[in-house]
Structure formats: C-alpha cells, structure tokens
Amino acid sequence: MLRIGLTGGIGSGKSTVADLLSAEGFLIIDADAIARDIVEPGQPALAELVEAFGEDILNPDGTLNRPGLAAKAFVSSEQTALLNSITHPRIAEETARRFAEAEAAGTKAAVYDMPLLVDKGLDRTMDLVVVVDVEEDERVRRLVAKRGLEEDDVRRRIASQVPDEIRLKAADIVIDNNGPVENLRAQADRLIAEILTRIK
C-alpha cells in the first residue's frame, strides 16, 4: 500500500487538498479527526488534559473547550510540549491501527493528513510526502478572515510548528497554494495522476 503523507502549516490549505483527494476516492486518515476522537468525554486523554491544564478547559457538558485549551497550551513551548506528550502517543496508536486496517482491506493508497508530519519525523515513514505551502502572512490573513482567530494567536501557532523551509526539504511534491483555488485544483489533479501512476 502506498502511504502518502500530506502536510502543511496551519492555514496552508492542506485540508482542501485532502478533500479533493477524498472526492477522487482516496482513503484519508485525518490526524486532526483522530485528535478530536481521542479527547471525547470518557477517553483517557481528556482526563489527562484536565489534570494537566485544569477543569476550566471543559465545557459545562463535559466536552473539551478547544479555545480554552488552546489559550493555555500555546502560551509557551513547554505548555505545547505538555499537550503533545498527552495527545501524540494516542494519535500515533490510532493512526497505526487505521493504516493496518486499510492495508488488510487491500487499499492501494492511503493519505495521512497530518499537520505535524515533519515535526514528528513521520515523513520518513511515508512513501510520498506532499507539502502544501503558503507564505506566512497569507496564512495569517486567511485564518483571521475565515476562522475569526486573533493574529497573535495565529502567529504563536505558526511559531510552534516546524519552520516552512524544513517542511519543504522533506517534500517529494510541493503544492503552492499562494494563488487562487483553481491553481490549487490543477496541482491536486497532477498529484492524483502521480499517485495513480505509482499504484498501477
């Protein structure tokens, strides 16, 4: 099975590329979705997060208050490391399970949509690494406009991730998403053609 790592910094448009691949029938293993699943009420990771960051990261109904957690977890590299030490081992375990399930089912290619692919050294476990790249100021502009995030918060999150140049060095294929969405679609089509060539 061809393992494709899809990554890019926050606000790069990586999820849009994943959606385009999914629409073509490719299996997407979404690290962010797995990260949400492991902090559902009753999951051990949620209890550990409460222990580490306090009860006020919970909503009244017992679910995780994501902005509340983000406000505490992204204030320093130590706090971000604490968050990652709780969530990342569980994300890795569930990811491995999903890859194994896909392989057992005879899936020819699986796309691992993972923001921290290079940060965690997981690019080395992939057969093909695809990086979606956008200049930092453009990413900030998009995230402030589309998600209503504060500029300082966005820049802190970007700073907590591996620098773009390191991510780009790990890439087999770079998708430049500085332009219009049509340009992104054309590059996604070329990526799809490349994947299909490799799994024939």
Curated annotation (Swiss-Prot):
Matches recorded under InterPro entries: Depp_CoAkinase (IPR001977), P-loop_NTPase (IPR027417)
Metabolic or biological pathway: Cofactor biosynthesis; coenzyme A biosynthesis; CoA from (R)-pantothenate: step 5/5
Entry keyword Kinase: yes
Enzyme class per UniProt: transferase
Catalyses which reaction(s): 3'-dephospho-CoA + ATP = ADP + CoA + H(+)
GO biological process: coenzyme A biosynthetic process
Full protein name: Dephospho-CoA kinase
Name of encoding gene: coaE
